[in-house]
């Protein structure tokens, strides 16, 4: 949750010291304690310990040295050809020691790993004090085939170099275009600063380099800071995740390639008019080039190497409801009942930190969430085929040793006994404020059993269905080990008011003219409390505040090169653990800060496998890194209830698709601030087409469940009916993404990669290859503009609602009717979409009859597929894949696999049939149909498919 979200804990290195409102926790192995709503006097974390040291980012510092101008570079000597490439030694020409101490000698290794992949690896000859990212933490792409033999003529990529004033180029062999070139730019490689520059073509199109709130294209002038950061979704700032990969889409040659730097270092990337500059503050150079040649090819090649996305359970495609403020079991129950009352499908209800006792992980509040009522609620939820997901913040509370009941908090003792918590350089426990529940030191030391145990014990108490992993950048609300020697004052308040009332509203919201203003006002919950005036003093420590050069690892708290970190002072320790915090094997946070969330996700995923053997773990996490998609889905973080953030959710989804995190969604209707009926209506409909669909908001904001406003409820029911009808299509896309790495939401420029006019389109998107969504992203309008590539030429589009072909023109920005409650949706000709009659839950929907929507292209052809299994098994023993093809007025269905879907096929709708057929046959039997405006509606097929819609091959002819 937001960095405003509270100092939920005085933290222990890898654990959280949940601190806030109340007394001892009801935790695993502890007895119930006083209510967390207690009004007794409490200590407060002093504000001064939250303030970092003011840094001037180098990019804003006019007096900063330009490394590219000052550095002398290296010469390449001792080049040796290898079966897969070459090796050599880079010798420093002259030390300049601009932002660290230059390394005299570097090892160069070039490896042709596959026909479409090339690796360039540069590291110091002496690796003392150099962090090299271990392969067991983040997988390293390996050579395909025989490592001792390769036919270089087969490679799509060619490596060329110059010995004197070393530089290199990567060239596409088929077109001879230079994809990457450091010519004219010296390599800088020191203990705390690495820099290389590559030329780019003019009018380049660079995408990726997440995570930030930005449009699809990183235009010239963009600065991308890659440093995981707990901050509430600032536009153009570094936020939760780090993904050092970009796509370079070139329209002159109609090709796309990808470049990936495998590093966990703090990084900064500058996009110029004709160049890209990449910097890191530690580590080595480990570059991978993927040749594409299409955007989809390049994405798949990259994602395949970092790890294909997790296969999410079928139920995850249902609607999820959450908010910070469901603070009693009665409120949770009321929300679930209201969704049923208003006939709005609800699959999963979520809990934010409200359920915890004093905000301690793995606990429940015995007064607001009494265990018997809590379990009864969960039993009823599961009985109705619904699900529950609680939050798990990345921290373990440090109990007060002077309080016997408080000291019974077992998760702390588990971790302490196995020595998994972060340490200060002197070996003492690093104690911050709001830290991680998944113990990072444990990950590096391979100790997982305690994590498995606490999660399993937690599940035994309150049987959840998945985990929401938050605050795992990792976040700490104070600078340094501020809790050292102070945990005996726990629990303690944060240094700000928790849940203060939100006063902002979306652009276009007029209070005086808002017919629902009165009801909105009445729904505001006065939950803010005033914190105590007492304080917890910070621990004293000696810190080098200067960005000075230092030998060895260097000055890691304040490195000589200051990045632009989106915190008020740019201090690396602001809202984060200090860079000098030490992990189990001596690794410092400075080198692996960006990995924290990823390693938590890995451990949590495997702990969930202990809870749900051979079931697909469900997890949504905030901080991500390459390969995180193998373990988790992702949500867009603490956005704002405003139109701009509805728009930004689309390019953010594209960026996560590139990064291998296709199961993505934003907080629908907005997290921070107050939403209104118009924005929420539009956003609920937009969100219904994202893979992950959740409404969530801030404690102090007004209610924004879709049933709060009648207009939003109706709009939601309309779009949810479409989503649930298309669940088989979405599940098939989930499977495709899991097996191929393809994103689910797709940019127009990926679908039509040779049309430069589409390069920046990020206000529309494809769902798979078959659906085009054109949302309204501004207030006070009833029309929206959209483009439809190839329309009127080689492409055909059909209106979802009328099922008629729309006569658009290629390259024209078409005006679409979009009254409130209506989201324009079109089907691209040439696709077959599997459907299933929607029910209230995913489980109900899966029991209903199937259908097919066939959208013919200009040649009367179409194709598609359907994937089915039990929807939850990690290792799928039984599955069904149905291939659909249409040509010559015949639809053919060819199933393969042994999974039995008992539900019949009820109907088939065929779009784009020019003349009314004389008859329609299922196999050789005449079947009922109607014809209207180029659409054939075939019904009554259930009597021919009683044994299951896809139990055998069939044809339908017309």
From Swiss-Prot:
It comes from Schwanniomyces occidentalis (Yeast). Glycans are attached at residues 61, 78, 107, 197, 403, 416, 513, 580, 602, 813, 907. It catalyses: Hydrolysis of terminal (1->4)-linked alpha-D-glucose residues successively from non-reducing ends of the chains with release of beta-D-glucose. SUPFAM superfamilies: (Trans)glycosidases (SSF51445), Galactose mutarotase-like (SSF74650), Glycosyl hydrolase domain (SSF51011). Residues 1-22 form the signal peptide. One of its GO terms (molecular function) is carbohydrate binding. The gene is GAM1. This glucoamylase has a specificity toward both alpha-1,4 and alpha-1,6 linkages. InterPro entries: Gal_mutarotase_sf_dom (IPR011013), Glyco_hydro_31_AS (IPR030458), Glyco_hydro_31_C (IPR048395), Glyco_hydro_31_CS (IPR030459), Glyco_hydro_31_TIM (IPR000322), Glyco_hydro_b (IPR013780), Glycoside_hydrolase_SF (IPR017853). The active site is at residues 470, 473, 638. One of its GO terms (biological process) is polysaccharide catabolic process. The lineage of its organism: Eukaryota, Fungi, Dikarya, Ascomycota, Saccharomycotina. Keywords: Carbohydrate metabolism, Glycoprotein, Glycosidase, Hydrolase, Polysaccharide degradation, Signal. This is Glucoamylase 1. It is an enzyme of class 3 (hydrolase).
């Amino acid at each position: 949750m937001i960095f405003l979200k509270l100092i939920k804990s005085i933290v222990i290195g890898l654990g959280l010291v949940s601190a806030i409102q109340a007394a001892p926790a009801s935790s695993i192995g502890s007895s119930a304690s006083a209510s967390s709503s207690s009004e007794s006097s409490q200590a407060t974390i002093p504000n001064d310990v939250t303030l970092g040291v003011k840094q001037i980012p180098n990019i804003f510092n006019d007096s900063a040295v330009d490394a590219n101008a000052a550095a002398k570079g290296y010469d390449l000597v001792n080049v040796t050809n290898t079966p897969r490439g070459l090796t050599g030694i880079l010798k420093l020409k002259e030390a300049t020691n601009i932002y660290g101490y230059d390394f005299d000698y570097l090892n160069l290794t070039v490896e042709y790993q596959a026909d479409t992949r090339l690796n360039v690896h540069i590291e110091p000859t002496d690796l003392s004090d150099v962090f090299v990212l271990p392969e067991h933490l983040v997988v390293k792409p390996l050579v395909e085939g025989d490592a001792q033999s390769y036919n270089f003529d087969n490679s799509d990529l060619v490596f060329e170099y110059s010995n004197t004033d070393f530089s290199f180029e990567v060239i596409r062999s088929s077109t001879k275009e230079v994809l990457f070139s450091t010519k004219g730019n010296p390599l800088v490689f020191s203990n705390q600063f690495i820099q290389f520059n590559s030329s780019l073509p003019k009018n380049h199109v660079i995408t990726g380099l997440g995570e930030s709130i930005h449009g699809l294209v990183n235009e010239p002038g963009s600065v991308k800071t890659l440093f995981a950061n707990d901050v509430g979704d600032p536009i153009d700032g570094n936020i939760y995740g780090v993904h050092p990969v970009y796509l370079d889409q070139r329209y002159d040659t109609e090709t796309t390639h990808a470049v990936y730097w495998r590093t966990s270092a703090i990084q900064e990337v500058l996009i110029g008019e004709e160049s890209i500059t990449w910097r890191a503050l530690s580590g080595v150079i480990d570059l991978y080039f993927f040749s594409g040649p299409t955007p989809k090819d390049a994405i798949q090649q990259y994602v395949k190497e970092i790890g294909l996305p997790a296969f999410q359970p079928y139920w995850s495609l249902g609607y999820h409801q959450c908010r910070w403020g469901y603070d009693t079991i009665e409120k949770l129950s009321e929300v679930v009942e209201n969704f049923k009352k208003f006939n709005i499908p609800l699959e999963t209800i979520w809990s934010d930190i409200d359920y915890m006792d004093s905000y301690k992980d793995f606990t429940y509040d015995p007064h607001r969430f009494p265990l018997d009522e809590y379990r009864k609620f969960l039993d009823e939820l599961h009985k109705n085929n619904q699900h529950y997901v609680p939050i798990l913040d990345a921290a373990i509370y440090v109990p007060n040793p002077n309080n016997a009941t408080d000291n019974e908090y077992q998760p702390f003792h588990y971790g302490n006994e196995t020595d998994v918590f972060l340490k200060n350089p002197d070996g003492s426990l690093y104690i911050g404020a709001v830290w991680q529940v998944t113990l990072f030191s444990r990950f590096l030391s391979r100790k997982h059993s305690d994590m498995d145990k606490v999660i399993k014990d937690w599940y035994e108490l309150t049987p959840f269905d998945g985990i929401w992993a938050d605050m795992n950048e990792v976040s700490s609300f104070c600078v340094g080990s501020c809790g050292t020697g102070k945990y005996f004052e726990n629990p303690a308040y944060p240094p700000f008011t928790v849940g203060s009332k939100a006063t902002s509203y979306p652009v276009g919201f007029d209070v005086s003219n808002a017919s629902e203003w009165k009801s909105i006002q009445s729904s505001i919950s006065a939950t803010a409390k005033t914190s105590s005036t007492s304080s917890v003093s910070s621990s004293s420590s000696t810190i080098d505040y200067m960005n000075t050069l230092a030998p060895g690892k260097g000055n890691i708290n304040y490195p000589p090169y200051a990045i632009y970190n989106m915190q008020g002072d740019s201090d690396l320790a602001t809202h984060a653990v200090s860079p000098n915090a030490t992990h189990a094997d001596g690794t410092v946070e400075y080198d692996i800060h960006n990995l924290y969330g990823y390693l938590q996700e890995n451990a949590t995923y495997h702990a969930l496998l202990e809870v749900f053997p051979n079931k697909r773990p469900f997890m949504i996490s905030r901080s991500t890194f390459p390969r995180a998609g193998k373990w988790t889905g992702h949500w867009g973080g603490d956005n704002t209830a405003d139109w701009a953030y509805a728009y930004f959710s689309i390019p953010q989804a594209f960026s996560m698709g590139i990064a291998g995190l296709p199961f993505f969604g934003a907080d629908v209707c907005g997290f921070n601030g107050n939403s209104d009926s118009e924005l929420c209506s539009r956003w609920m409909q937009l969100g219904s087409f994202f893979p992950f669909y959740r409404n969530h908001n801030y404690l102090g904001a007004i209610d924004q469940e879709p049933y709060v406003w009648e207009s939003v409820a109706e709009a939601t029911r309309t779009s949810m009916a479409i989503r649930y009808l298309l669940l088989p299509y979405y599940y098939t896309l989930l499977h495709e993404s899991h097996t191929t790495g393809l994103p689910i939401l797709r940019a127009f420029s990926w679908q039509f990669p040779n049309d430069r006019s589409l390069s920046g389109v990020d206000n529309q998107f494809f769902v798979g290859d078959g659906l085009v969504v054109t949302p309204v992203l501004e207030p006070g309008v009833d029309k929206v503009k959209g483009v439809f590539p190839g329309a009127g030429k080689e492409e055909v589009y059909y209106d979802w609602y009328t099922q008629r072909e729309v006569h658009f023109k290629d390259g024209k920005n078409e005006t679409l009717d979009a009254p409130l409650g209506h989201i324009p949706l079109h089907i691209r000709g040439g696709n077959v979409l599997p459907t299933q009659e929607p029910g209230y839950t995913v489980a109900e929907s899966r029991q209903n009859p199937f259908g097919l929507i066939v959208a013919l292209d200009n040649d009367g052809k179409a194709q598609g597929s359907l994937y089915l299994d039990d929807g939850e098994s990690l290792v799928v023993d039984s599955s069904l894949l149905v291939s659909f093809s249409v040509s010559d007025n015949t639809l053919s269905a060819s199933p393969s696999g042994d999974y039995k879907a008992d539900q019949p096929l009820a109907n088939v709708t065929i779009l784009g049939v020019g003349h009314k057929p004389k008859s329609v046959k299922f196999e050789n039997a005449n079947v009922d149909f109607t014809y209207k405006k180029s659409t054939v509606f075939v019904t009554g097929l259930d009597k021919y498919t009683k044994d299951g819609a896809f139990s055998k091959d069939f044809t339908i002819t017309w």
